[in-house]
A protein has these predicted regions:
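A nucleotide-sugar donor-handling region in carbohydrate enzymes
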Residues: 141-209, 232-234, 238-239
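Nucleotide-activated donor-dependent transferases that construct or modify glycoconjugates
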Residues: 3-17
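Short N-terminal targeting/anchoring amphipathic segment
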Residues: 85, 96-113
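Short amphipathic alpha-helix
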Residues: 21-31
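A conserved mid-protein helix/loop that constitutes part of the nucleotide-sugar donor-binding site
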Residues: 22, 205-218
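Conserved nucleotide-sugar phosphate-binding/catalytic loop shared by glycosyltransferases and other
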Residues: 34-92
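Nucleotide-activated donor-binding/catalytic signature segment of Leloir-type glycosyltransferases, i.e.
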Residues: 239-249
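A conserved nucleotide-sugar
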Residues: 216-233, 237-240
Length: 249
C-alpha cells in the first residue's frame, strides 16, 4: 500500500530567509494536488512565518524553540550549522519524535545546516530521503538529491554523495509555483524593444536591508520606468520603504 505522508524539515528566519520554506511549500502544494499529505517540521519560528505555513493548509509540527544566538553572516568562515541552533544529532532526534508518529513514505530536507550526519541517522531508521540543496559544499547521504542551480553537474557532487543516490541537477528541475507558470506565455509575448518596467526582489526577509539601499540609489537616477519592489512583511524598515516607493513612481 502506497504511503501518502511526506515530512519536510525546513526552517525560515531573518538570517535564513524565506526561500527554503517557499520552495518546500511549492513542492508540497504539488504533492497535495496529487493526493499526498504534507507535514512541516519547523524550529525557531515566529508568528508571521507560522502563518505562511498555516495558510497553505499543510500540517505544521513545531520543534522545541531554542534561544536564538547572534550570527554574523559576514564573517569569513560562516558556518551554516549555526542555523540549526542545536547539534544535528539533537535536531534529528527531536524531528524523529514527529516523524515516527507520522510514518512518512518520504522525508524532504531543505537546510544548509544539515548534512550526512543527519541523513545517516535517518537512513539507519529506514527513512527515504529527498534532499534539496544549491551549494554543493558538503557531504550528503540520501535517495534523491535536487539541485536546480543552472549549470550544475554530477562532478560537482563527486565524492560528496552516496553512489546510488539519484541526482536531479540543473534548472530543468526548478520548482516553480503555479502562479508563475500560468504567466509564462504572457511573459513571452511581451514587447521587449524598450525597458519600461523594473522589478526588484531581495527575498522574503532581506536581512541586509538591500531593498532600501537599492531604492535610495534608484531615486538618484532619472529613469522613466515603472519600478516594482517585492518584499515580505519581515523586511527591515518596511514602513520607510513604503514611503520612499511612493516618491519613485
Amino acid at each position: 500500500m502506497k504511503n501518502y505522508n511526506v515530512c519536510f524539515r525546513v526552517d525560515a528566519s531573518s538570517f535564513i530567509g524565506m526561500g527554503h520554506l517557499m520552495r518546500c511549500l511549492s513542492l508540497a502544494d504539488y504533492l497535495k494536488q496529487n493526493g499526498y499529505k504534507c507535514h512541516f517540521l519547523v524550529r525557531n519560528f515566529n508568528t508571521k512565518i507560522l502563518n505562511v505555513v498555516k495558510r497553505s493548509r499543510h500540517s505544521l509540527h513545531l520543534l522545541p524553540k531554542k534561544k536564538m544566538v547572534s550570527i554574523n553572516i559576514n564573517k569569513s568562515k560562516f558556518i551554516y550549522s549555526d542555523w540549526l541552533q542545536v547539534t544535528q544529532q539533537v535536531d534529528f532526534m527531536e524531528s524523529y519524535k514527529f516523524i515516527k508518529k507520522i510514518n512518512p513514505g518520504l522525508v524532504v530536507v531543505d537546510h544548509y545546516g544539515i548534512d550526512k550526519t543527519w541523513h545517516l541517522l535517518a537512513k539507519q531508521r529506514g527513512l527515504k530521503l529527498f534532499v534539496l540543496d544549491d551549494l554543493g559544499d558538503r557531504q550528503h547521504y540520501c535517495d534523491i538529491l535536487l539541485d536546480t542551480t543552472p549549470g550544475r553537474k554530477k562532478d560537482d557532487y563527486l565524492g560528496k554523495i552516496n553512489r546510488e543516490a539519484i541526482l536531479l541537477l540543473g534548472n530543468n528541475y526548478c520548482i516553480i509555483r503555479d502562479e508563475f507558470l500560468k504567466l509564462r506565455k504572457l511573459s513571452l509575448r511581451r514587447d521587449r524593444t524598450r525597458l519600461s518596467k523594473l522589478m526588484v526582489s531581495m527575498g522574503g526577509m532581506d536581512a541586509d536591508n538591500n531593498t532600501l539601499k537599492i531604492m535610495e540609489k534608484l531615486k538618484t537616477l532619472d529613469l522613466d520606468i515603472k519600478i516594482t519592489f517585492i518584499m515580505g512583511n519581515e523586511t527591515k524598515d518596511y514602513k520607510k520603504i513604503i514611503a520612499l516607493s511612493k516618491q519613485l513612481n
